[in-house]
A protein has these predicted regions:
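Anionic-ligand binding patches
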Residues: 21-170
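Short, acidic/turn-prone active-site loops that include or flank metal/cofactor-
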Residues: 10-16
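N-terminal G-site helix/loop of the GST-like fold
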Residues: 1-9, 164, 168
Length: 170
């Protein structure tokens, strides 16, 4: 993306959210929590994000095991769901948080196809049990919105947020 001289840090925190938040509020809340858990020098720019999959307003996290992955993928069959990402950019005391939502439609797939996908191992560390950037793309019929959001980081939104901090990528 044109960013040089950076460090990747995975903050260790328990993602806790108040009940009753809308999907966009939920991912923004967790993104801000992650930002607060990362220490930085005053002039450093910290970027954090959190992506979640929502089906019928309910969060689909990462599958606990293969049976859970099959349950999630079966529930997504022939339907659409929402992928939300909260992005936070922080420099010193200044912090900006925004959300991006994308609608994703899954095609109908056979149980055998879903089990083969699960055996690949790809779904096991992904919210909603699929990765659109890999074999999971074969389950997706249509995307309405930012493709990169479904991957976990809406790059256009991030570039616009960085521009507000004086960082341009092009």
């Amino acid at each position: 993306m044109g960013i040089r001289d950076f460090v990747v840090s995975a903050p260790q925190l328990e993602e806790v959210c108040p009940e009753g938040l809308r999907p966009e509020e939920t991912v923004c809340h967790i993104s801000r929590q992650k930002s607060g858990a990362v220490s930085a020098r005053e002039d450093d720019i910290v970027i954090t994000a959190d992506t979640m999959v929502f089906l019928d307003g309910k969060r689909l996290g990462k599958p606990r095991d293969e049976a859970d992955a099959l349950r999630m993928l079966t529930a997504l069959q022939g339907r659409h769901h929402t992928v939300c990402t909260g992005v936070t950019v922080r420099q010193g005391q200044r912090m900006l948080t925004r959300a991006q939502s994308t609608q994703v439609w899954f095609r109908s797939a056979s149980t055998e196809e879903l089990k083969a996908y699960i055996r690949s191992g790809e779904p096991m560390d992904k919210a909603g049990a699929y990765g659109v950037q890999g074999l999971g793309a074969l389950l997706v019929e249509r995307i309405d919105g930012d493709f990169f959001n479904v991957m976990g980081l809406p790059v256009l939104l991030l570039s616009r947020m960085l521009a507000e901090f004086g960082v341009t990528l092009l």
